[in-house]
Amino acid sequence: MKEKFNEKVIPVILKFINTKGIQSIKNGMVTSMSPLIIGSIFLILSNFPVKAVVDVLESTGIKPVLDQVCGATFSISALIAVIGISYSYAKLENQEPLNCGIISLATFLILMPSSITTEGGEVVSGIINKTWTAGQGMIGAIIVGLIVPPIYCWFLKKNIRIKMPAGVPEGVTNAFSALIPAFVILTGAAVIHGICSIGFDTTGIEIIYKVVQTPLQKMTDSLGGAVLMCFTGPFLWFFGVHGSTVVGGIMTGLLQANSLANQAIIDSGVELTIANGGHIVTQQFYDQFINITGAGITIGLVMYMFFFAKSKQLKALGKLGIIPAIFGINEPVLFGAPVVMNPMLAIPFIGMPVIACLIQYFALYTGICPLYGATQIPWTCPPIISGFLLAGWKSALLQLVILCVSFFVYLPFIKKIDKMNLVQEKNQPVEDEDEDW
């Protein structure tokens, strides 16, 4: 069974995750992390958990300054995504990437609404509606970022470009080379916008949001969708495939869209609850609770090896893996224990993230713990601290519960392995140190 899976399924999965599209999404979405993390720092400061501090920030006029940074970083996440994905795709094709990113950005702006209606019914035109440059435009940004670059690269590969004489600066040459593909792409975007606007009184990005993004977000936010996501990552890891890359490449756009939708509810002054449209499954749901201490939540495994292991091999591995695990890095354990391709650890490794998913989903669904806004904590931030920074002491306590559960889930399996290793070590003949003298 295992051999057939490795021969038939693994090559297909590897081929999928190595496609230019998936690689572009993975690399492109990472570009949004820096501004989102910086924005999250300002968001934490602006909504400091001590009321006296918030009062001082408001009275001194500092809070609006902090909020300005939050709005600027969170509100352009879709724009960053479309540029990042397009840039990454063109780079993989060995074509000039910056022009590709700019053309994709222009395409995205053409396809999105350029007006808003005020509460009084007045239509204000000629604006960039930040509703669509953040979470609601995320899937549209991904789609544009996957469609524009292949067209752009096709023109350049076929040498359909304006050629400049030798000696012209490279930047000027690249700009003129992009003119023909840019004209074709932006004209096509204008035609699509005209059809949507004149024929259906809407825009391309709005159609994508209603037809594609909303159903996908609902599916992702369901318990079944969450369990499937949490199962897939460690399942692939078990067979040596980087499951986090696969899940991240497919799910990051949707998870970030859910996070930004939650933040929009907070910014509107409404309480962030499920009843008010809040989402349970967000980027933080996955990063800070399902992938805590690494894929498979292996901290329980490492804690046993560090404190209780009797065999020399596991003791040494525990010492090697404890510090990296605290910062979310568990490759030493995955390949050292090993967890990968080890049938004795398959059940806890694949099952623990699913258990954590069920615990967290229940805590958020029932309101025991608060839903998450757009605050992004680096995945390398140690547990408990990351939970507190994310949503206060309740989230920190939830992380602690998951860490404790991890220990008991792994315990019977690693004890058995430890006992087997100990017997094997005792049965190994001791080499005579003076043998070679």
Predicted features along the sequence, with ranges:
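Generic multipass alpha-helical transmembrane bundles of integral membrane proteins
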Residues: 184-308
